[in-house]
């Protein structure tokens, strides 16, 4: 299968390790195991004693009951047996496409978005239609445009973007009605779900639509990207059977240690979420103040998530801007051209506060040389 290079991941692979100020990171400030046990109040010594005595088999092939039950509680209507474990959310998205999409199927995706959501179906041979989100519309989908792209042959509609836009329950409901009219699946990458700037329940697509497919992981909301634990949740039995069948070919199980640690975090999801909501809210205030103080930069203020798409008014391509800034100051952001958004950069603002402040100061310093 021929597939386009994954622009954002190639960028991260090449430059992340040597960054002095990593404000390209999209996870909420990652936790160590020591921090996890401290946050949750679980006994580290008891856990290690019990785990170290276990034989390292494949473990529960479908994931432990504790893990799947913990994930199901993140939704209103999902049951434990409606959760399929995967290798991270990236693995989940890939798994969904390879299980459900065939050459010739129509897939409607949006842009800017995570490149998986259009490059994988395109590589499979699907007919991929792109709806471009507009800054003047706060990066929210235009329902009339979406209707014009969705045909009777549409197999799937994909929702996700890196701008921090937040779709209301009413807007999601309208998208559901469009999908239901042609029997299409809706794949919603929900890795940032509940990382909002206001205290409100964020609806999941699976609680609104019988053919909704939710993808998520332990990486962003739970600050545990090192576990590589993700999942697919759906009520659709035919889709779930396809996921499990394909899973036998490429996963088998998720690993006993990952399962055990993820189960701890999920048991205390309220504590983990409270910590991370505090971080994204306090840090976005810092980024927003920086935007106000630097007239060469502008953005649509995020309402959710951990990233912001920040535009600049310098006459310089985003790859050149970001490379020069990286080499001259050590500040590391993601070029907007990775998302086909020229003259912009994606800033991850959920890192530790000192990295964020120092990174933004480095951007200011670099901008002064242009």
Residue ranges and their predicted role:
Residues 135-197:
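Active-site phosphate-binding strand-loop segment of PLP-dependent enzymes
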Residues 77, 108, 148, 324-333, ...:
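PLP-dependent enzyme catalytic core of the Aspartate aminotransferase-like
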Residues 2-88, 95, 268, 369-370:
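N-terminal small-domain helix-loop-helix segment of the aminotransferase-like
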Residues 81, 99-121, 134:
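Conserved PLP-anchoring active-site segment centered on the Schiff-base-forming lysine
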Residues 243-247, 265-288:
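Structural signature of PLP-dependent enzymes
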Residues 105, 126, 181-184, 210:
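A short helix->loop->beta-strand "cap" motif at the edges of active sites that frequently abuts
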Residues 263, 279-288, 299-312:
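Conserved glycine-rich beta-strand-loop-beta hairpin in the small C-terminal domain of fold type I
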């Amino acid at each position: 299968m021929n597939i386009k290079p994954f622009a954002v991941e190639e960028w991260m692979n090449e430059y992340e390790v040597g960054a002095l100020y990593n404000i390209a990171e999209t996870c909420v400030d990652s936790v160590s195991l020591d921090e996890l046990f401290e946050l949750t109040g679980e006994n580290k010594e008891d856990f290690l004693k019990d785990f170290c005595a276990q034989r390292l088999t494949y473990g529960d092939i479908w994931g432990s009951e504790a893990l799947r039950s913990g994930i199901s509680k993140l939704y209103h209507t999902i049951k434990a047996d409606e959760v399929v474990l995967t290798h991270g959310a990236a693995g989940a998205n890939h798994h969904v496409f390879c299980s459900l999409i065939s050459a010739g199927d129509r897939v409607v995706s949006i842009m800017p978005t995570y490149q998986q959501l259009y490059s994988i179906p395109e590589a499979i041979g699907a007919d991929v239609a792109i709806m471009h989100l507009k800054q003047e519309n706060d990066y929210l989908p235009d329902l009339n445009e979406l209707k014009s792209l969705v045909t009777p042959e549409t197999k799937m509609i994909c929702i996700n973007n890196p701008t921090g836009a937040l779709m209301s329950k009413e807007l999601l409901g309208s998208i559901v009605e469009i999908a239901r009219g042609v029997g299409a699946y809706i794949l919603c990458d929900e890795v940032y779900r509940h990382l909002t700037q206001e205290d409100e329940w964020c609806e999941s697509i699976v609680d609104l639509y019988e053919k909704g497919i939710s993808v998520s992981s332990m990486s962003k909301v739970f600050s545990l990207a090192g576990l590589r634990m993700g999942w697919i949740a759906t009520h659709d039995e035919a889709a779930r059977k396809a996921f499990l069948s394909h899973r036998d070919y490429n996963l088998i199980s998720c690993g006993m240690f990952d399962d055990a640690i993820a189960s701890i975090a999920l048991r205390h999801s309220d504590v983990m979420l409270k910590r991370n909501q505090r971080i994204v809210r306090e840090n976005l205030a810092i980024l927003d103040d920086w935007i106000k103080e630097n007239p060469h930069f502008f953005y649509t203020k995020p309402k959710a998530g951990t990233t912001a798409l920040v535009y600049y008014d310098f006459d310089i391509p985003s790859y050149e801007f970001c490379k020069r800034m990286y080499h001259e100051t050590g500040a590391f952001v993601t070029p907007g051209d990775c998302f086909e958004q020229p003259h912009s950069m994606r800033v991850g603002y959920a890192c530790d506060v000192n990295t964020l402040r120092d990174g933004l100061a480095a951007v200011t310093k670099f901008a002064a040389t242009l």
